[in-house]
Structures are given as structure tokens and as C-alpha cells.
């Protein structure tokens, strides 16, 4: 009998060791795969400690890295300034940065890690609407507010239940951009007939196009679409060339619209090209070519040609000193986002307090203008229409449209 007991104990011990080894390697595998922690683990928000921890969930590599890198620059500059001035309530701001690689799934994972593992008190980013939509679900579950500098999709801050308590934006909505494009093309450029050409694979572009169609008072001669990642637009552009119209309205990101503009100009199409804030990056000019990036107009939340507040000139000077280039819209919006979070962090004890304070932010003056957060967590502020010639911003006009 003792013999059989020894055998049984030996087998049980062997199985236990095997299970321990398997569990060890499984944990390594999950870490290697970037497995996210449980997003429900911190649903009541995070406490503010010795520092105010700001997570950065940004597109630093991948298809739209130009947006993310500009926003990262604006974020770092703002944090440096605030910390040099003594911080907030005597506490320094601390950055924790994650690269979402311009991928929506990675944006969700980045926010989860920032909220659960790093215990940040607020998150700035992502830059693009699809990534924000994915990351916002995490903020809603963890109680860590997300402030996107440039995510414009209308439903980012609201859902079927109403306003999302922990999701905010610093820029205007897609529908507002569509209204601005419709009014500016018809009234300012006297474009009574247009071609509408937009990215049908992008919710951002489709949202702007839909609102443009609702608001435009002129005739849309033809409506055509392209898809993110396309490289050859000759077929559609050749058809446009033979039509009678005054301008091309082209909702989309610079990754495609810069190439389309080059191919259009190469075909001899010299009509005005109008687009949303997705045009607002030097990469647009790089893809189109300086000469081709002329007679181009786009919506923007910022321009170095217009001082939207008394803070504008100081920001431009500081940014150029830090990065040896002029700031674009994305850098300016991200810079303002940090200052908004800093303002909302005053007297706050938790991330939930920061969210509550952001929701009641009024008459905040940033480099992108004066703004108040409305009931849907969108800023009430003016938009600009910027003109680009030979690859450079040559003018900008403030456009006020009823929202």
C-alpha cells in the first residue's frame, strides 16, 4: 500500500510541476503578445498621486504618423512649459507615451495599458477618429478621461445613451467641417458647381461628405469615391477633366489627397481643390509637390497666419525654438489639449474629477482660440479656411457657421 501511495504522490507532484511550468510560459506568451489587462479592473478612475500622470496614445508610426508626431511635439512643449512654471497645485505633469502604430486595435490596447498598468489620470489622443472610437470604450470603462486633439467624427463623444462622460475633443466635428466647406465654396469661391470626390473607406471622410451634400446650395456635377491606400486615381480624374465645374471638394486624409492633387495637376486640372483638416500637414505638400499644392483650400483649427488669441505669437516662437519649424494645426491642438487638462486638474483628486472639470470648462483661451466645452463635450470655437499656394499657407480666414 505504501508503495502505491508513493507512486501516487510522485505523479501528483509531477503534474503540479508541469502545471506551474505551463503557467509560467503562458504568462510570458501573453506579455509577448501584448495582451491587455482587464479593462474593468479600474472602473472608478485613478487617484492623482505625487504627479499628474498624462497618457499619450498617439500615431507615432504607421500610415498617419505625421499627425501623431506633430501632436507629440505640441504635448511635450506644453508639459515642459507647465512644469517650468511650477506645475499644477505644486505637482508636475508626468507623460507616459504609447505608440498606437496608426492601428485602431492598438489604440484600444494602448489606452487599456495606460489606464490599468500605468494608472494615468488623463489621456491625450489618439489623433484620428477611428483610433479614438476604439480607445474611447476603454475610457468609459476605466473612468480615465480621453481628450482627442483632432478626432472629428461626430459620434466620438456621444452614443445611444447620450454624452460619453469620459470622452472630449479639442477640435470641431466632421459635420461642422462639411458645413464650412459647403458655405465657403459657394459663398467665398463662387463655386456653384462642384465635383465631390471622397474616401469611401473612411468614416471621417464619409461624414464630411454627407454633411457637405446636405448643406451645399449649388450643383454636385458628379460624386465619386476612392479608398484608403489607393495610389492610382487617373481613371476618375480623367473623367472629371471633361466635366463643367468650378471646384473639386475632396474629403480625406493627406495620405491619399496629396497624391490625388499631384495627379490632378499633372493632368492639367487647375480648378480649386477644397478639403478638410486632413490636408493640414506638410506631408500633403510633400506628396503633391510644391507647385501642385496651389489653389488648395482646407478647413483648419489653427494657422500661423491668424492670431486666434494673444497666446499665438508666444507659442509659435517657442515651438520654432524647440523644433526648428512652424507648428501646424495638429501641434497647436495637442498643445491646447494639455493646457485644458492642466486647468481641469486644479483641485482634482482623481481622474473622474478631471473629467467633471473638463465638462464644465468655459472661456478657455488657447492658441487655437477661445473655447467652451458644450453639453456633448465638443468645443464651441471658430474654424479657419486656409489657402495653400506653392506648398505654403498664404492666407487664412475665420469662418463662423451656426452649429
Predicted regions and their residues:
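C-terminal motif of bacterial Sec signal peptides marking the signal peptidase cleavage site
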Residues: 29-32
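Beta-alpha junction/loop-to-helix N-cap segments that form part of ligand/metal-binding clefts
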Residues: 38-43, 67-71, 85-158, 226-230, ...
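Extracytoplasmic "Venus flytrap"
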Residues: 45-74, 98-105, 127-128, 197-206, ...
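An alpha-beta-alpha
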Residues: 60, 164-225, 247
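Hydrophobic alpha-helical segments within soluble ligand-binding/sensing domains
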Residues: 107, 168-193, 206, 232-234, ...
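Extracellular/periplasmic bilobed ligand-binding domains
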Residues: 139, 208-299
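Extracellular/periplasmic periplasmic-binding protein-like sensory domains
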Residues: 261-335, 389, 399-402
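Segments of small-molecule ligand-sensing domains
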Residues: 322-331, 342-393
Amino acid at each position: 500500500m505504501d508503495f502505491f501511495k508513493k507512486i501516487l504522490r510522485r505523479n501528483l507532484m509531477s503534474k503540479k510541476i508541469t502545471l506551474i511550468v505551463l503557467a509560467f510560459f503562458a504568462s510570458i506568451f501573453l506579455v509577448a503578445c501584448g495582451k491587455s489587462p482587464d479593462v474593468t479592473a479600474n472602473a472608478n478612475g485613478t487617484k492623482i498621486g505625487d504627479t499628474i500622470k498624462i497618457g499619450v496614445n498617439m500615431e507615432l508610426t504607421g500610415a498617419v504618423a505625421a499627425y501623431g508626431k506633430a501632436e507629440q511635439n505640441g504635448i511635450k512643449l506644453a508639459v515642459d512649459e507647465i512644469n517650468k512654471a511650477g506645475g499644477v497645485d505644486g505637482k508636475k505633469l508626468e507623460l507616459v507615451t504609447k505608440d498606437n502604430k496608426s492601428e485602431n486595435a492598438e489604440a484600444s490596447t494602448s489606452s487599456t495599458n495606460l489606464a490599468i498598468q500605468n494608472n494615468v489620470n488623463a489621456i491625450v489622443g489618439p489623433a484620428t477618429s477611428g483610433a479614438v472610437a476604439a480607445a474611447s470604450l476603454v475610457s468609459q470603462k476605466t473612468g480615465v478621461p480621453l481628450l482627442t486633439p483632432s478626432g472629428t467624427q461626430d459620434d466620438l463623444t456621444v452614443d445611444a445613451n447620450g454624452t460619453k462622460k469620459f470622452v472630449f475633443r479639442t477640435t470641431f466635428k466632421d459635420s461642422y467641417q462639411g458645413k464650412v466647406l459647403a458655405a465657403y465654396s459657394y459663398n467665398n469661391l463662387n463655386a456653384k458647381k462642384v465635383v465631390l470626390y471622397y474616401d469611401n473607406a473612411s468614416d471621417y471622410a464619409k461624414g464630411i461628405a454627407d454633411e457637405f451634400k446636405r448643406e451645399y446650395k449649388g450643383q454636385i456635377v458628379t460624386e465619386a469615391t476612392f479608398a484608403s491606400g489607393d495610389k492610382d486615381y487617373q481613371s476618375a480624374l480623367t473623367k472629371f477633366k471633361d466635366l463643367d465645374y468650378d471646384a473639386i471638394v475632396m474629403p480625406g486624409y493627406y495620405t491619399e489627397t496629396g497624391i490625388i492633387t499631384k495627379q490632378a495637376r499633372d493632368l492639367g486640372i487647375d480648378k480649386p481643390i477644397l478639403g478638410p483638416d486632413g490636408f493640414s500637414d506638410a506631408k500633403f505638400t510633400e506628396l503633391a509637390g510644391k507647385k501642385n499644392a496651389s489653389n488648395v483650400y482646407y478647413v483648419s483649427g489653427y494657422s500661423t497666419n491668424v492670431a486666434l488669441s494673444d497666446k499665438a505669437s508666444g507659442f509659435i516662437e517657442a515651438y520654432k525654438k524647440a523644433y526648428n519649424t512652424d507648428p501646424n494645426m495638429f501641434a497647436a491642438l495637442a498643445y491646447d489639449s494639455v493646457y485644458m487638462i492642466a486647468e481641469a486638474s486644479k483641485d482634482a483628486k482623481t481622474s473622474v474629477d478631471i473629467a467633471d472639470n473638463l465638462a464644465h470648462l468655459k472661456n478657455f483661451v488657447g492658441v487655437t482660440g477661445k473655447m467652451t466645452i458644450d453639453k456633448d463635450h465638443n468645443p464651441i470655437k471658430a474654424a479657419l479656411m486656409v489657402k495653400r499656394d506653392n506648398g505654403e499657407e498664404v492666407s487664412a480666414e475665420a469662418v463662423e457657421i451656426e452649429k
